[in-house]
Swiss-Prot record:
NCBIfam families (alphabetical): lipid_A_lpxD (TIGR01853), PRK00892.1 (NF002060)
Gene: lpxD
Top-rank taxon, per record: Bacteria
Catalytic residue positions: 246
Protein name listed in UniProt: UDP-3-O-acylglucosamine N-acyltransferase
Pfam families: Hexapep, LpxD
Catalysed reactions, as listed in the record: a UDP-3-O-[(3R)-3-hydroxyacyl]-alpha-D-glucosamine + a (3R)-hydroxyacyl-[ACP] = a UDP-2-N,3-O-bis[(3R)-3-hydroxyacyl]-alpha-D-glucosamine + holo-[ACP] + H(+)
Length: 353
């Protein structure tokens, strides 16, 4: 693929796409800006990396309209676009190809119940188990060792990697990706305390509903609802090692980073950003576009859209940063207080004399 071809390709998404340099060089694939060499395409989206424009060995670099090219590396061509980061994502998609997860068709060792309805061009890998009354849409690929219990519905164009477990009654939309080790639809953590200190298990009779275009990372757990449904709305992206408890609702296009723990019946709005290791108490609500810093402890609802929160317990970032600054000044305040106490003591001694 030549640079001129990449310019035309990006022209589907951006207008204008400006070429600086030659368009005849062959591009064989993408590379990091600091490691790229002849034949590679890379990008610079952040001003902190502008220095690499003069240093890179890449044949092509995707940059913003305002990127300085006066000291550009000789032999490097540039494509200027409004959003170089997104442009490079499209280039990665073009070069990435498709992983082989399972061969087309049903593997000989797969176990598929007689009542299952399979769409066209479905791929079921070795030792896949599909329970009674499941429905799998066209073009879905299910990797080796994955288990779908009874009554699971999976939409079209989904990719389920090896060793995923999907419990009964789960409903999954189209173009969903689920990575290895994830469990969807296990029982919620519901137990009724008794007077003698023991617990009675609360039957978890609900389901999980996952919308279109959701991606779920490896070793993540999404519990079924006690009644009703735990819902992951369209376009949400969930990292590895995330726990989402029963009856939660995760808004569309919300992003949740690794090791976040979300207790039961939490409602998170649309387009929220949840940092790694953030922890949520139960029955809370976050408004749309809330940003939660890593390691935040959320113990109450935040209903103002677009708020940034951090700390333990979490509070608006502006308040928490002010308090952090005050805490950092405690040592100096202590020294001043001790000096004042010493002066006061000396004054008292003088007056007493």
């Amino acid at each position: 693929m030549k640079i001129a071809d990449i310019k035309a390709f990006l022209g589907r998404y951006f207008d204008p796409v400006e070429l600086v340099g030659t368009g005849d060089i062959e591009i064989v694939g993408p590379a990091k800006i600091e490691e790229a060499s002849t034949g590679h395409v890379s990008f610079v989206a952040n001003e902190k990396y502008y220095r690499y424009i003069a240093q890179t060995g890449a044949s092509l670099v995707i940059v913003s309209q305002k990127a300085p090219l006066d000291d550009a590396s000789p032999g490097t061509s540039f494509l200027k676009v409004a959003d170089p980061y997104t442009a490079f994502v499209f280039i990665l998609q073009h070069f990435s190809g498709k992983r082989r997860i399972a061969d087309t068709g049903i593997a000989a060792s797969a176990s598929v119940a007689a009542s299952v309805r399979l769409g066209e061009n479905v791929s079921l890998g070795e030792h896949v188990v599909i329970g009674e009354n499941c429905v799998i849409g066209d073009g879905t690929v299910i990797g080796p060792g994955t288990v779908l219990m009874d009554g699971v519905t999976v939409g079209s164009g989904c990719t389920i990697f090896p060793l995923v477990t999907i419990y009964d009654g789960t409903v999954i939309g189209d173009r969903v990706t689920i990575h290895s080790g994830t469990v969807v639809g296990a029982d919620g953590f519901g137990f009724a305390p008794q007077k003698d200190g023991s617990y009675i298990k609360i039957p978890q009779m609900g389901t999980v509903e996952i919308g279109d275009d959701v991606e779920i990372g490896a070793n993540t757990t999404i519990d079924r609802a006690t009644m009703g449904a735990t819902v992951i709305e369209k376009g949400a992206k969930i990292d590895n090692l995330v726990q989402i408890a029963h009856n939660c609702r995760i808004g569309g296009d919300t992003v949740i980073a690794s090791q976040a723990g979300i207790s039961g019946s939490v409602k998170i709005g649309r387009q929220c950003l949840i940092g790694g290791q953030a922890g949520f108490a139960g029955h809370l609500e976050l408004a749309d576009r809330t940003s939660v810093a890593a390691k935040a402890g959320i113990s109450k609802s935040f209903l103002e859209p677009g708020l940034a929160i951090r700390g333990v317990p979490a509070q608006p970032m502006r308040d928490q940063l002010r308090q952090e600054a005050q805490v950092r000044g405690l040592g100096e305040m202590k020294s001043k207080l001790e000096a004042l106490e010493a002066k006061l003591l000396a004054l008292q001694q003088q007056l007493g004399e």
